[in-house]
Amino acid sequence: MMGIQILPPQLANQIAAGEVVERPASVVKELVENSLDAGASRVDIEIDKGGSKLIKIRDNGSGIPKDELALALSRHATSKLHTLDDLEAILSFGFRGEALASISSVSRLTLTSRTADQTEAWQAHAEGADMAVKVMPAAHPVGSTIEVVDLFFNTPARRRFLKSDKTEFTHIDEWLKRIALVRGDIHFTLTHNGKTVRNYRPAMNEAQYLQRLTQVSGRPFAEQALKIECQHDDLRLSGYLQSPWSPVITDTHYFYVNGRLIRDRLVNHAVRQAFAQKAELEQPGYVLMLDIDPHQVDVNVHPAKHEVRFHQSRYVHDYILQALQSALEEAGELNVVHSSSLDEVEDVFVDSPTSAVGIAAPFALGADTLESAQPLVASAAVQVKSAGAGREGASFGTQTNAFGSMATSRDSSRGSYSASESRQRTELPSKAAIASYGALLQTPAYSVKNHDYQPSLPMPAILDSQYWVMATADKLSLLPIKSVALATRCQEIEAKLATGLIGQPLLMPVSVAADADWQAVLDEHDTLIRQLGLELTIRYQQLIIKKVPPYIRESQLAKVIPEWLQSLRFETPAPSALAFWLAKHSLTGFVSAPEIWAAFSQLAEEKKQLIANKAILLPWQSWLEEQASE
């Protein structure tokens, strides 16, 4: 057995590089973060062959003095902190002083830099484990340029594990998207094999930032995102949250703490819990930025700084949850029609009773026409059109931003309606006609008392296979069929939970890698797990799923069950939350509108009214009066 000895610096740096330099994207991350710490307002990234051949980062930051260039390539050398107290309040990206030394130990690295008070630039070169640094004069403006050539040239085993050039560049591009969202003030460019792939111009106002959000997250997310602005004591949460009505499935899940992108189960749980009673989204998208006193968060808990530890984690969780719930509740108060097929009510006009789209004719369920559906109004139709970016349009309670999206913010106007002046108009009805039109609604085809929807009546007409068209004495509204299906299924499951669900054995048990503390979770919540009809065991670090309730049998159990176990770490869910969780996963396929209406009819009156309150109001009278007065 060999005796204990101190490792030589070259070997120590290569071992450290195993944690710091995982792939080319890791190099880009460390070097760009150094540029941001240096106060750069522009960062240009040049990549060749996915980063295996060349990674070049150029910035206009403060630069590095000549006498510190060689020191910058030494291990544990940093300008970010000097005392133990500094480590307790870190605001910079870097602080360990490992990146440049680790990168230079597995590549050929050249660092060229100039400060504002120097008349000339200087260049330092280091190659592999040799650790010898050569410094020579060079030509360069104020700022720094770092070239990393032949990454892993001296560690062939590491080089063999690199993926294709396209895959490695995709990782670089994805990381740049993340940093571009939190540092909107920085101009980023990304070039691959001589071709400019990304050009994120500085975002100096909200409209420009929304343009960047569109570039990174896509127009569908940006158009319907809810803006978040919330502050309490030393906590401030800002950013954008996916609209609960958005049908878009997005991979935008970015959370930042003091400008640093992190992954945190606490945050994911808060977001899912906020959406739990608001939408059927499996993974709602978000770009959230939390500013917190640096003394209240420890960023030195992960080798790649991907995780942090909050000193008051429960307080932070509840703060985020409450802020998101407030935003969702306020958005719900806006009478907004959020749908891929009903984003914009383009025109309201008098049409013939045989109109194929609208209120004038009976609606269809699938291919079958509902013979029993009575016309609500004999001569009116609503034409529906998807909202397009950069196009003038009408919207309920939305605020059109500078780049043509329809992001709903917390200070959006409520219940307002605006129409494009450039739209072609048909002849509008007179005020007398409007009054007559209102009188028709005063005597609907079936009686409605106290604005309550009577389930004993025939099923209402269906619009776009998604909504029931509901009428009261003087109102028209759209009731989402999927929301009713979810609510009725919740009621059914919650009633059965009192006596316990009967689990169904799986033909082939599902096995998932188990976290270290899952056994403790299973032991603590054994009664609850049995009540749900679940049979879960852990053997050889594997979670084995043997029985599940019928409501989630068709779900992706390898994903659904682990996520639920993670949530149990934070709290024991109430029966209503359990019912919602099961119901959400049971409605992934086709649902029958008549069956849903029949189930809705069996609910107690107060339950029916709560569901009916989810209907989206169509303020047709105010709009018609507004048009007639012009």
From Swiss-Prot:
| Entry GO MF terms | ATP binding; ATP hydrolysis activity; ATP-dependent DNA damage sensor activity; mismatched DNA binding
CDD domains from the xrefs? HATPase_MutL-MLH-PMS-like, MutL_Trans_MutL
Against SMART domains, the record matches this protein to: DNA_mis_repair (SM01340), MutL_C (SM00853)
Q: Where is this region: Disordered?
A: 398-425
Xref: InterPro entries: DNA_mismatch_repair_CS, DNA_mismatch_repair_MutL, DNA_mismatch_S5_2-like, HATPase_C_sf, MutL/Mlh/PMS, MutL/Mlh/Pms-like, MutL_C, MutL_C_regsub
Query: Pfam families this protein is in?
Result: DNA_mis_repair, HATPase_c_3, MutL_C
Q: Which UniProt keywords apply?
A: DNA damage, DNA repair
For this protein, the parts annotated as crossing the membrane are none
Instruction: Name the job this protein performs.
Output: This protein is involved in the repair of mismatches in DNA. It is required for dam-dependent methyl-directed DNA mismatch repair. May act as a 'molecular matchmaker', a protein that promotes the formation of a stable complex between two or more DNA-binding proteins in an ATP-dependent manner without itself being part of a final effector complex.
According to UniProt, the name of this protein is: DNA mismatch repair protein MutL
Annotated source species: Shewanella baltica (strain OS185)
Q: Tell me the name of the encoding gene.
A: mutL
